Amino acid sequence: IVSGDTKVAGKGQVDGVFITTTGMGQIEDGVNVGGTLAQPGDAIIVTGDVGRHGCTILLAREDFGIEADVTSDCAPLWNTVEAVMNTTHDLHVIRDATRGGVGTVLYEIAEQSNVGIRLDAASVPVAPEVKGVCGMLGLEPLYLACEGRMVIMAPKDKADKIVETLRQCPYSKDAAIIGEVTTDQPG
């Protein structure tokens, strides 16, 4: 696997340096995950609270006149993935929730796997300060970028153990089961 990130900016719009990275790795034998592999009955797990990065960027870029103690959720994900893989290989989807946040990731997976998604809104972890800012600005935290969060879909009988493992990792203390994959309204 090779992945990377690029930025596109108009001439004269950049006043500093962009640092980008490329990651290379391999998928372990016996592991088969992807956006097309979500299955009805899978639990939907998020590795932590949502919307913090997007909220942080909005507050830094725009002059809303709002002061809030919100920090980005930027975090390395490799150790979290490794911990989950050491718990079980019975995983169907692992996706970062960067662009468009958890909501967009769930929409894309539903479309790619031709399944439905049922969320329990009360189970989605959102930091109080992010809730407050989103409430004032009329934003939905599920659709704000997350730079250190993943969405995992796995069989329901594995979900509690996965969440228990995640909560032992330094960047996923607020991991939670937030819903399930269904056959209702596929795609």
Which residue ranges define each predicted feature?
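Helix-biased detector of long, well-ordered alpha-helical tracts
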Residues: V2-G187
